[in-house]
């Protein structure tokens, strides 16, 4: 079981490295020597930033599958509103309304 988890972790890292290589290709060989050097430096800095980001993302632990928040959300989703009776169609007249109409 442990070997399988290690293998899956290795495959995930390889996929991540492949993705990073696709995102940040090696610079072209055209231009003066200083232009090529600057492009290589920029690429190296970008590469280190991407690797740092990838390691941060890879080391973030997964949230627990059954946290109290998840249980509370499931309970709230299970709630339903009860059907209310229809309101009355004709309203009874009150004495205060009649007094205002006569004056």
UniProtKB/Swiss-Prot annotation:
GO terms for molecular function: DNA-binding transcription factor activity; RNA binding. A motif (Nuclear localization signal and RNA-binding (RRE)) lies at residues 35-49. Residues 80-103 are annotated as: Disordered. InterPro entries: REV_protein. Gene3D superfamilies: 6.10.140.630. Residues 92-103 have a biased composition (Polar residues). Residues 16-24 are annotated as: Homomultimerization. It comes from the Viruses. A motif (Nuclear export signal and binding to XPO1) lies at residues 71-82. GO terms for biological process: mRNA transport. Pfam families: REV. GO terms for cellular component: host cell cytoplasm; host cell nucleolus. It is found in: Host nucleus, Host nucleolus; Host cytoplasm. Keywords: AIDS, Host cytoplasm, Host nucleus, mRNA transport, RNA-binding, Transport. Its main location: host cell. Homomultimer; when bound to the RRE. Multimeric assembly is essential for activity. Escorts unspliced or incompletely spliced viral pre-mRNAs (late transcripts) out of the nucleus of infected cells. These pre-mRNAs carry a recognition sequence called Rev responsive element (RRE) located in the env gene, that is not present in fully spliced viral mRNAs (early transcripts). This function is essential since most viral proteins are translated from unspliced or partially spliced pre-mRNAs which cannot exit the nucleus by the pathway used by fully processed cellular mRNAs. The RNA-binding motif binds to the RRE, a stem-and-loop structure present in incompletely spliced viral pre-mRNAs. This region also contains the NLS which mediates nuclear localization. These overlapping functions prevent Rev bound to RRE from undesirable return to the nucleus. When Rev binds the RRE, the NLS becomes masked while the NES remains accessible. This isolate is from a Gambian case of 'neuro-AIDS'. This is Protein Rev. The gene is rev.
């Amino acid at each position: 079981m442990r070997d399988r988890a290690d293998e899956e972790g290795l495959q995930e890292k390889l996929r991540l490295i492949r993705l990073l290589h696709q995102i940040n290709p090696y610079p072209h060989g055209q231009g003066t020597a200083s232009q090529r050097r600057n492009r290589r430096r920029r690429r190296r800095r970008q590469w280190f930033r991407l690797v740092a980001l990838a390691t941060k993302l890879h080391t973030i632990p997964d949230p627990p599958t059954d946290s109290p928040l998840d249980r509370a959300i499931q309970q709230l989703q299970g709630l339903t509103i009860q059907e209310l009776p229809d309101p009355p169609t004709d309203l009874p007249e009150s004495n205060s309304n009649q007094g205002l109409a006569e004056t």
